[in-house]
Amino acid sequence: MAIAGICLIGFGIGTFYPNYISKINIEEKAADKTILWAKEIGFAEPRITVGSDEEFIKTMQKCIAYLNLELHKGERIPDDLIIAQAIIESNAGLSRFAREGNNLFGIRVWNKDAGMLPHGYTDTLSWRVKSYNTKCASVRDYIKILNTKQAYAEFRKIRDKQNKWYGK
């Protein structure tokens, strides 16, 4: 009788609270299929355009939505945070680094042979401002930095806690 009760409890728990790892694997496979499907029908990286603030924000939102297809739900960064940072760092895409190097966040590279040198600095500077092929590529790199660098570990803890609270 005790064994039957334990089995019933285990079944109930498994039914209403599925295995976390299995759930993640299923979500990852579904996301991979969605990405493949989107690319098959011609869904491509959107172009971030600069003109008015509204245009910049709308095209940033499209880029973020596109990049979110590649990310697991728990790795996504709030749109408002990304857009606000891009507006502050690049003057809504109008800065020299945004115009010439597609860098919306002032991301640096520690390679003297790559990137852009800020005006007024000499070649002795040990870093450069990283250049990208597209503005959306700089958004991808910014998301990667927030998701991987030790400096943003506390941010990730807070995001994970909020995702848990809101069921994301």
Predicted features, each with a name:
Residues E89:
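Pyridoxal 5′-phosphate
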Residues M1-I83, A92-K168:
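Catalytic cores of secreted/periplasmic lytic hydrolases that degrade extracellular macromolecules
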